[in-house]
Each structure stands twice: as C-alpha cells, then as structure tokens.
Amino acid sequence: MKIAVICSHSHTLYWYRLELLQEFIKNGHEVYGFADEPEELWSELFAEKGITYKQISISRNSMNPFTDIRTYFSIRYALKELKPDKVLVFHAKAVVYGSLAANHLKIYDVYPLMTGLGSVFIDGGKKREAVKSILVTEYRVALKNCPVVFFQNSDDRKEFINDKIINKQRAVLVNGSGVNLDFFQARPLPHDFSFLCISRLIRDKGVYEYLEACRIVKQNYPQVKCMLVGPMDSNPTAIGMDVLQPYLDQGVIEYYGETDDIREYMEQCSVFVLPSYREGTPKTNLEAMATGRPIITTDAPGCRETVDDGLNGFLVPIRDINALADKMIYLIRNPHLLQEMARMGREKAEKVFDSKKVNRKICREMRLI
C-alpha cells in the first residue's frame, strides 16, 4: 500500500517520526512524506531511509485564510497525484486540511495523530477562545470520516470527546511518540550539578519560567549550571534574543542554540526541566527518562503522564516560578535522591514509552499489520 504522511514541519517529520515511517516500510508499504521545506534540503536524507519526500505549501503559525486555502489546494494536488491508500496527518494545519483534501478526493482511510492541541487550547484571552471555537468547528468537519484519531494524552482525548468533535470509540490513546531505547541509553549522572531545558523558545513551553527559576537558583547556588537548548521560533509567543540576552549577560543560563542530537546535553545534566503549559507528550521528557535523568515538569496535559510525582521527578503547577525554583533547589540539597529517580525514569521509559511498542500499536490501528 501507498501511505502518505503529511505534517507542517520537515524537521519534525524526519527527526520525530522517522522510526514510525520505517515501521511502515518494514511491514511492506511505500511511504511518501509531505512537509514545508524544499525538496533539495530533504529528499536525499529521506531517500536514504527508503522514503519519498515532497514539499507542500503549509505554514504552522499563519492566521491568514488565503494561506490556509493555498495549503488545502497544495495538499489536495499532492494527494490527487499520489493516490495513496492511507494518509497519516499530524500538526493542526495538516490534520484539518489534509483530512479535508483526502475526503474530497474520496480517500477516507485518514488517520490524524494529535501531537498536542497547541496554544489556542491553553486558557487565555478572548482572541484564543475565538480561534479555538473556529478550530473546533474545523476539526468536527475534517475528522468526521476518520476511522481512528490518535491522542498522546487522556486530557486531549477527553477534550475532543467533550467538544463533540469525535466519539470515544474512534479516539485511540497512544503513549506519545515513544523513545528509542537503543539510541537513548542510560548514562551515569555527572559529577557537577546542572539543569537542562530543551525546547523551542516560546512562552507556552515555560521557557520564561525556567529562566526566572534559574535566576533564583543561581542567587543561592552560583556554582550550579543552568543550560538551555533549542531553536528560536516564529510562534506569536516566541522568546527572542532581546529577552534571552540579559540572562546570558548575567550568567544565569548558558544557551547552546539548536541541535539535531541532544544526547550530549542530556548526559551533561543532572536534572531535566520542562515547565510547559501543555503538550501532546513531550519527547524530550521521554528522552530524559531513557537517559536516566530525573525530571521536573508541570502538572499539565501531556507532561503529567511522564512523571510519577516524587518517584522519577516532580510535578509543579503551570506558570509557578517559585514552585519550580523550590523543586530545583530541593534536588540540589538532596543529591542522594537522583540515582533512584534516574533508575525509576529509565524503568518507566522501558515499560510505557518504548517506541517499538508505540509504533506497533499505531500500525495495528491503521490495519497495516
């Protein structure tokens, strides 16, 4: 069978979904990837893995209706040309316009993967509520013929059911994207205490809270290293260098920019921190667990699934700088807890978040095996 996989961002398609695409191939299917960046940047990389890559016109953050219309027709043209047997879509724009385009071409074997509901589903402001209302309506129309919709956490699944977007029989829960336990192996904790946050630099990921919590930590423990890794972003809530620079100048954090291999930084940290407001299931948390790192994250949809509070890390309230700093300082003062937390995290990754198990479940639900 031909399987089309459509998303908003080529980087995510390759670095976050490659294992799933290879699982499709392993089961005897042809795989075609569609995303935003030019073919000359990605075709060769995908081809080496047995995947055909094509560029489509799609913007992750645009609010322009004309841009969205162009996205719809770009996806429709790609699907009409390919004539796939099944379509997997993820990211909001791809889910809505990919599902609609496929349905209009009488392709009904479409499988949306909800990797998080995005910033509009986070409480805050009339504008977000208005956008959410529009998006809910779009989802209802786009997903009405989908046999299955995948969710990475129970909160997102419940929200879609309560909003009457889909019924619970079609709402399938999977354990995030999973983590490759061979690629991310348990590593010894470092001698010197350090914290690490890996994230796109946007407010909704809790980056500002991390920066301010690090300021409090450094005031009390100036020898502790606080690291930040991740790309700048075009999201409306992006945190730019103008915000970041004072923290760098004052020695609060060390910023390393974007990387395609985070293992080096994971191995350097004692504790991984992600104070996000909402996630699908944060892959960096899973990678930290697999590496054997305690985690401090928020009691938020998607994040809370990754931490058993007090066992492999701690949960803190969303947007609570002081609570975050308190837990960071608590672990600095109680380093004897780290080893057992690290062991529990790796064990949880093996039992719950093994990417092989996650990918097999998706294949079964898509009737590929």
Where are these regions (language model features)?
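Acidic anion/phosphate-binding donor-loop and adjacent secondary structure
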Residues: M63-T67, I161-N162, N175-F193, D260, ...
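Aromatic "clamp/platform" in nucleotide-sugar-dependent glycosyltransferases that forms part
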Residues: E258, Y277
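Short hydrophobic beta-strand element within catalytic cores of glycosyltransferases
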Residues: P294-T297, V307
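Conserved acidic donor-binding segment of nucleotide-sugar-dependent glycosyltransferases
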Residues: D309-G310, F314-I321, Y330-P335
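A short, well-ordered alpha-helix in the C-terminal region of glycosyltransferases
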Residues: A323, Y330, L337-V352, V358-R364
